[in-house]
């Protein structure tokens, strides 16, 4: 009987680990303090990069926060206003956007009218200058204007349908990055490796031709993308990490070139990412947080850079030790998001939009777990 209950406990722990994959997120404030939300039911401020190697992150959990029980929770920094916008953090109210005022360490809840926007199926970025979310949902580009919000309005905001992209979206599991007020769509079906389709935000215009980022560039495969901030001004570089974690690619939209850095130590297709000016942070499906340093002035330093654990977060919120399919596999999981891009999709996708069966596998896995528990208790 003891062995049976031990197995049941492990199975339940596996389920909780799977839930963690989409329920936590990380972000930076404008002083480049790393904030981790929803780790073990709490929120933490890990401080700036020079403090990550030791000590304990500060507990900043307070009232008004979201429950962090969504399946694809993602965080976005509004640099002009030092606010963190959190999407998909409340399974009971999935359209709500929670606002964390980093200056006052306070939360508020912004209601949102969705219209034709599908909150269960979208990918989004937050534009630096306009403070507008742009999202691709079921083949349509939508926008939501956050204005100058550091706390919620009493009136709801609205998702607005802009137009359909000029490129094909059939079977496309979007990968989106923001740089120079342009949205870069990676891994579009039919596109070559190292290329992207571009939407010019300020002119509301899809460029008719694709953009290339060098001959030794990123692969044509699904992955996660996030932009490197600057102390002031728009982002000019973004990182792309393919789902297999084989490398980290940093793309400069100023020179249309790509650097190749080490891939994360944990190969996790369900991981999410967020970048400051000089660090790229990974949050894995099990809640482990690590980073790699980045120097936009030194290719040599970037080539030599390696990934390290953020120790002061690990000391207060250790990652779960249960291995899951998303924590060790190299495929594409549909139960995931992307920090700085939110991926909420009903199907998974491989290279150039080949649809997979992630949801079916997850559902089957959960059914087997529940069935196993029932048999063990007999």
Language-model features and meaning:
Residues 20-28, 64-81, 114-128, 165-175, ...:
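Repeated scaffold domains used in trafficking and secretory/extracellular systems
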Residues 349-378:
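Cleavable C-terminal sorting propeptides in eukaryotic secreted/cell-surface proteins
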Residues 124-217:
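Solenoidal tandem-repeat scaffolds enriched in leucines and small polar residues
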Residues 36-53, 83-100, 138-147, 191-202, ...:
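Structural motif
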Residues 19-34, 43, 50-52, 209, ...:
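Fungal extracellular Ser/Thr-rich, low-complexity intrinsically disordered regions
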Residues 55-67, 106-115, 157-166, 209-218, ...:
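A short beta-strand motif characteristic of beta-propeller blades
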Residues 2, 11-27, 373-378:
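N-terminal signal peptide
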Residues 54-121:
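Blade-loop segments of beta-propeller domains
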């Amino acid at each position: 009987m003891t062995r049976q209950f031990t197995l049941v406990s492990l199975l339940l722990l596996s389920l909780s680990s799977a839930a963690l994959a989409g329920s936590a997120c990380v972000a930076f404030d404008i002083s480049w303090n790393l904030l981790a939300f929803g780790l073990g039911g709490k929120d933490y401020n890990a401080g700036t990069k020079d403090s990550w190697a030791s000590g304990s992150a500060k507990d900043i959990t307070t009232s008004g926060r979201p429950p962090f029980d969504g399946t694809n929770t993602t965080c976005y920094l509004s640099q002009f206003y030092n606010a963190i916008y959190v999407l998909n953090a409340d399974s009971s109210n999935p359209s709500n956007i929670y606002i964390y005022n980093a200056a006052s360490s306070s939360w508020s809840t912004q209601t949102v009218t969705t219209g034709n926007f599908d909150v269960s199926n979208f990918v989004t970025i937050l534009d630096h200058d306009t403070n507008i979310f742009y999202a691709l949902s079921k083949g349509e580009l939508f926008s939501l204007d956050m204005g100058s919000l550091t706390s919620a309005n009493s009136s709801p905001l609205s998702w607005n349908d802009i137009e359909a992209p000029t490129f094909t979206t059939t079977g496309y599991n979007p990968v989106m990055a923001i740089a120079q007020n342009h949205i870069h769509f990676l891994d579009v079906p039919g596109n070559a490796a190292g290329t992207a389709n571009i939407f010019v935000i300020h002119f509301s215009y899809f460029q008719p031709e694709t953009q290339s980022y060098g001959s030794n560039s990123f692969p044509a495969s699904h992955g996660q993308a996030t932009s490197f901030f600057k102390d002031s001004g728009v982002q000019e570089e973004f990182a792309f990490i393919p789902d297999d974690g084989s490398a980290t690619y940093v793309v400069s939209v100023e020179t249309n070139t790509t650097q190749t850095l080490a891939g994360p130590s944990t190969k996790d297709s369900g991981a999410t990412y967020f970048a400051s000016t000089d660090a790229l942070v990974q949050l894995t499906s099990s809640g482990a947080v690590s980073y790699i340093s980045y120097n936009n002035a030194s290719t040599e330093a970037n080539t030599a850079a390696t990934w390290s654990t953020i120790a002061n977060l690990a000391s207060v919120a250790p990652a779960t030790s249960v291995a899951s399919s998303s924590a060790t596999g190299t495929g594409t999981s549909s139960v995931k998001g992307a920090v700085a891009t939110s991926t909420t999709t009903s199907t998974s996708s491989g290279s150039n939009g080949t649809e997979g069966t992630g949801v079916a596998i997850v559902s089957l896995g959960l059914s087997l777990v529940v069935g196993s528990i029932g048999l063990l208790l007999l």
